[in-house]
Amino acid sequence: MGRLIVVSNRVATPTETKGSAGGLAVGVFGALKDTGGVWFGWSGDVVSETVANAGPTLEQDGAVTFATVGLTRKDYDQYYRGFSNATLWPVFHYRNDLARYERDEYAGYRRVNAWLAHKLVKLLQPDDIIWAHDYHLLPFAEALRAEGVTNRIGFFLHIPFPSPQILINIPPHEELVKSLCCYDLIGFQTDTDQLAFHDYIERHARGTVKPGGNVEAFGRKLRTGVYRIGVFPDEIAEQAKRYESRQHVMDLKQSLEGRKLIMSVDRLDYSKGLVERFRAFEQLLERSPEWRGNVTLVQIAPPTRADVSTYQHIRQDLEYEAGRINGRYSGLDYTPIRYLNQRYDRWKLMSLFRESQIGFVTPLHDGMNLVAKEYVAAQNPDDPGVLVLSMFAGAAAELTGSLIVNPHDSVGMCEALQRALSMPVDERQRRYEMNMAALRKNDLGVWRDTYLRDLRAVPLMKAAPNGAHGTGAGASRKTQDGAPDDAPAAS
């Protein structure tokens, strides 16, 4: 069995893959340890052109090599802040109103993908399989093919794939999808995402979709599939129970003074429906006066992309809403909303989930939402909390024991909170058991192993007539001065 090569925008360091690492890092690292391999991507550092060209930096942990490169300021601005997060992220989350398109940012996005491919080629061996992750790397396989790589290359999209009517708002949409079709296997989180991609192929790419998720488009044959990412529920349950007697939990219980607790944890992002959530909680306090002083919402929302104006605005909006609602409903000994704009250790969060009566997870659009799955897994089986979950989270299709809501309906969310707060223990246990059965059936290991099994089953590409192959020997395209034309832009 060949090595696994994982490529992602950011690489979790060896330290980060242990301890409190998130589900994806744990799952990917587990697969890498099984076969040996490389985790390749951006280090998170913005560096000079000289330092960027000198990479990748290699760090070894057993049979796993962590290979990272830095980005120049221009590449960071165009590839990451620009096209990835100012164009693709909003459009793929159905927020065309927040998207912008700049040709130079799109050019930078493609340039960085080509440069990353050029860096990776030197690390490849003939029987490696390559697994790229997420929207930052849509053209990455095309860039590898241009380098002569014939290895199996798979792609998994962690965020939603938008309907064709939304996607075509990006001017180079056809070029992007054509690049995406250079992968051998494209994995989606949900049936809806896969169907949206198939719809685009048939309507706009003049391609065909055949049984089994097989696609023919742009002169390529590829496979598509639905692979619902999961968690390791029993591990989470064990850790949540272990942490429930820690001081931070005792402090929270003491401060609540017997009040019910609603927990929400999200990155500070407009796709998460945070303002709508606060307004639904306000509806609860307004429509059910008996809950005033008797229930607290804790919203943990660590900052993300703080240098992007859209994210600065959502932070301001959320702070305003929290202040307004607290100003209206607080008492001398009661604050309805505790809004924390900071990061918490993952295992601390699991123990807080276990302490709460409701998990309130209501994104406007989300690929899967692992917080919803972690909330369920962290519960006490004898006295579980209730998950109130958006119908637009990918997890809603699996977690049918949840109270499913429309995040645009504040009254409907309020009614779900009322129901959850009053739900008898036998119903809560029944719903918890339904959700846990789903988590165990399709845990993180199943997601990982099923995807990699399908990728390994894809037929290998035939080598190009010039003998180029997947060993890393494919020649880089050169400019007249002899430098690769995909070298990083100067800072």
Where are these regions (language model features)?
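Catalytic cores of carbohydrate-active enzymes across secretory and cytosolic contexts
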Residues: 1-491
